[in-house]
Amino acid sequence: LLHIPSLPRRFTVVGAGVIGVEYASMFAALGIEVTVVDKRDRPLEFLDRELVDELLHQMRNAGVTFRLGETVERLEVVEKPSRHVVVSLESGKRLVSDLVLFSAGRIGATDHLNLSATGLKTDDRGRLAVDHEYRTSVPHIFAAGDVIGFPSLATTSAEQGRLAACAAFGIDT
């Protein structure tokens, strides 16, 4: 996405989380027709509803279309007459786009950590449960970042790691 040769006329973003909304805003500011698709009825659920409502209002005014409560069924690249992507939704709607960004979430990368040897269990998305100090159910094991889930952002993960390390070594934060 950072190395596209030219700007698209139509841009579809699958996923209305932080990354999806950020890129949708940037491309809309460039005058590009943007559609955001998300299976949830409300994007950015962790933010105050009034803030999200205002953000959506501003984004709609900038030309962004939201297809909330929709699930992508299929993506099809069509080569002729010009290369584009057809995004088919489970509702039967079809979106035609020049560029698609898939930013519909992360899963914890825990498959190869041999967690069974530790007694730790993950949820259905591979995430570990932690307390306020990032301590797992095994008292001497801490976890941070994508393996604990929300929000899966690099800066947040770095801060979680710092706090977990401080807790592990008994350092006040």
Which residue stretches match the model-derived regions?
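FAD-site-proximal beta/loop scaffold in flavoenzymes
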Residues: 1-8, 94-172
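Short, conserved glycine- and acidic-residue-centered signature motifs
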Residues: 17-20, 48, 52, 154-157
